[in-house]
Every structure is written in structure tokens, then in C-alpha cells.
């Protein structure tokens, strides 16, 4: 009997590892076990902090990134040549439309039907002028800063250019609509006001020529307007082609004012 205790104790000691594996006690609240990392686990790498404001192509500093047209990454001399060619094409298109093309259709049924409706363009300019103030950030984004293309320069800041051109658009569009509405209502305006529709049209013609660089800048530098919309180069090209149409229509409506000016200057 005395020899039985050591044998039982020996068996008990041998069974302790199995008992420990079968019955795991929960860890104490104050104690934590070290995590086991498998050999296949990848070590975590600290991520660089994200900038609060990331650069977006076509917006602000993002206009310096390569645009969809790729023009803004060309050498400055190449950019200048492309832009001057665009200006020349718009001018030539305006002259051709207002000259031989309008002359060919002037007096036709289509001309007589459509020509009286042209002052409706005043609504477009009036709305655009108001947008210069309500969407000033977007218009400023497509306004070329000084030094663009190596030659562009204005004495004012982009924001000021947005504001004063918006004011002129509101005046020109509203003045042209005022004259057209008076004619439609059969109201004779004082002669001192001059040819109201024509004066408004000439104002908008000059303004459209002045702001044309903004439309070209949107193409060359991919400048977004609205800020969250990236316009493809083909759409910009169509918009620039339509610039000639606008200029030709406004120049046609401005003829009475131009004739008055030539007469007053003794050129007629």
C-alpha cells in the first residue's frame, strides 16, 4: 500500500499537460496575453497623412497638370502659336459668317423668320452675367492668369475680371432685351437713347471678344467649369466654333450703332 502513492502521483504528473490543454482557464481581467504573429503575417506600414486639400486636375493648381488636350504641357512658344491660331480661326469664321454667308441668305424667308428673334440672346448673356456673381469661383477658374501662353496679360486680377465682365454682361443683355421688348410692345423710346438693341449688341460683341481667352484657356489647360465637371476637348472645340456664330450675330445686330459712329466721326 505505501508503494501506491508514488505511482499515482507519477500518473497524475504525466496527465497534467493533457488536462491543461483540455481545460483552458480564462485570462484574468488585468492580464493580457501577447498576440501571436504567424510567419505569413505582413508587418503594418504607417500610411502617410493625406492632405486636407488634394490637387484636382483642372481646378486651381491642378490646371498646371497635363490637360486632356495636352496643350498646356507643350513649350510656351508652341502654346502661343496654337492659341494665336485659334484666335485667328475665330476671327476668320466671324468675318466669313457676317460677310458672304449672311449676304447670301439675307432677305430669304429663313432670314426674315429668324433675324427678329436674335435679341433673345440677351437672356443668355443676362443669365451668364448673374452667374459671374453666383458662381464666381467657377468663372475665376477658367480665367487665365497673367503669363498664360507666354503673352497673356491684363491689369486686373482674375476675380476682378470675373466681376466686371459679369456686370457688363448683365447690362448688355438687359439693355438689348429692353430695346427688343419695347419694339415688341410698340413703345417708342426717346431718340436720346439711340438704337438700344444695337447698342446692347455692340456691347456684347466687344465683351465676347474680350472673354474669348477664357474659353480658349478652358481648352488648353483643361480648366473646369463647373469645378466638378471635366469637359472633353471636343466639347471645347465645338464651343469655340460657336464663338464665331455669336460674334457674327452680334456684329449684325450692332450695324446701326456702327453706322452712327462712322457718321459722327465723318467717315461717311
Kindly give the residue locations of the regions a language model identified.
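N-terminal chloroplast transit peptides
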Residues: 1-45, 53-54
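Membrane-interface extramembranous regions
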Residues: 55-268
